């Protein structure tokens, strides 16, 4: 087969011409070669480059780094808040609330208890602790309110003067309700004992 091909071609190899562009030859310029390339519109170029990226970006980064360092230094220099009875009461309340949810709630991987007595005992203990913690927080708020009224009497007087009309109206409503209750009780007693107070013994 190869012999037949050689016989047909006359034993000579034919070279195929290849057109390879030669850059830089013939006096051609690179601008002439790239002249047909599409240009990027000015609007797209302006939108693709963020404003302020060409100038001042390095200064902004340095200023941001300095501000972050100053903020972290100020946070480190701040003194911790002194512990108070109110803070301790709130921490205790949150702790017992989380304990109540953790001990009472049951998730899928955790097997349920074999008896309900265990759940009942745990719920009673956790609810009692949570109730005591709530009472402690309420008492602490009440104590702080009374302490503020004693230490700042003039501020308390100003607040009372602002709400004086409402306080008077509230007291009048309470007195009217008490009068109606007394009259109703007297009427019930007179109906039950019609001869009460009419016979005198000597």
Curated annotation (Swiss-Prot):
Residues 1-83 are annotated as: Disordered. Ubiquitously expressed in tissues including epidermal, intestinal, pharyngeal and uterine, and is also expressed in vulval muscle cells and gut granules. Transmembrane segments: none annotated. Keywords: Coiled coil, Cytoplasm, Nucleus. Residues 1-15, 28-45 have a biased composition (Acidic residues). Residues 159-184 form a coiled coil. One of its GO terms (cellular component) is cytoplasm. Disruption phenotype: Viable, but sterile with defective development that is prominent during the late larval stages of development. The developmental defects include a squat body stature referred to as a dumpy phenotype, irregular gut, defective gonadal growth, with incomplete gonad development in some animals, a protruding vulva phenotype, defective uterus and spermatheca formation, and excretory canal defects. It is found in: Nucleus; Cytoplasm. Plays a role in normal growth and development. Interacts with mdt-6 and mdt-30. This is Coiled-coil domain-containing protein mdt-28. The gene is mdt-28.
